[in-house]
């Protein structure tokens, strides 16, 4: 992907987020239901892809990846309304005549970068939470699980428009390109060396990351 293409994609997502269409709880639930239906439709293809990439059996693919994502979807569908609700909080003494509230708000445009070892779980599980929180998302699967990346791309393109959820495939060049863009939040799972790069980038651009790193 060329940088101009990545910038254009992010701009489309920023414009879509600015419309407020991702914010209503019912819109979030509808998106989660579309994702759940797509997973059911593509389950056989996902199982075959996980076997091709990692040699995982059907039972391992379901217990360690697909089933866990379905569980997260079910949980979020039950609780997203409560998570998004405005909450009353204590008011500081100096503002005693006022009432104080805490209102959860999405970050905006989120980048999810996932590893090869649990390529479905560690891509789609954080996507579920990003959607439930009201964000738009760019997903970057690992290049080292190409069959699973292709299956996830087909699945996500079947249920979401790219201004809401988009998939970028590729290797280090695409990683570098995406990390240079002004995402509002980054969720990264992978090697410590890459995680350190992800950590340093937000320091310059004032954006928060979530990092799950391992080894070198």
Please state what every model-predicted region is.
Residues 1-101:
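N-terminal Rossmann-like NAD(P)+-binding subdomain of aldehyde/semialdehyde dehydrogenases
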Residues 22, 104, 121-124, 146, ...:
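Glycine-rich phosphate-binding loop at the start of an alpha helix
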Residues 36-38, 49, 70-72, 76-77, ...:
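Alpha-helical structural signal in soluble globular domains
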Residues 41, 45, 68, 118, ...:
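Short alpha-helical
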Residues 91-163, 206:
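Conserved small-residue-rich beta-alpha loop and adjacent elements
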Residues 109, 159-216:
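Conserved NAD(P)+-binding/catalytic subdomain of aldehyde/semialdehyde dehydrogenases
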């Amino acid at each position: 992907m060329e940088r101009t293409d990545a910038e254009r994609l992010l701009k489309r997502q920023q414009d879509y987020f600015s419309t407020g269409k991702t914010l209503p709880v019912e819109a979030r639930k509808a998106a989660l239901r579309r994702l759940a239906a797509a997973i059911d439709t593509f389950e056989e293809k996902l199982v075959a892809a996980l076997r091709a990439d990692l040699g995982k059996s059907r039972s391992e693919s379901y217990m360690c990846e697909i089933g866990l994502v379905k569980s997260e979807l079910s949980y979020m569908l039950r609780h997203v309304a409560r998570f998004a609700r405005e909450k009353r909080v204590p008011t500081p003494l100096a503002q005693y005549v006022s009432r104080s509230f805490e209102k959860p708000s999405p970050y905006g445009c989120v980048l999810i970068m996932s590893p090869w070892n649990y390529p479905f779980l560690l891509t789609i599980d954080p996507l579920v939470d990003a959607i439930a929180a009201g964000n738009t998302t760019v997903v970057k699967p690992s290049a080292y699980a190409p069959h699973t990346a292709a299956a996830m791309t087909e699945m996500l393109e079947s249920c979401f428009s790219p201004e809401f959820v988009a998939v970028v495939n590729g290797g280090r060049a695409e990683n570098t390109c995406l990390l240079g863009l002004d995402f509002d939040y980054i969720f990264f799972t992978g090697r410590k060396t890459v995680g350190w790069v992800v950590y340093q980038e937000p320091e310059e651009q004032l954006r928060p990351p979530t990092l799950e790193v391992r080894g070198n």
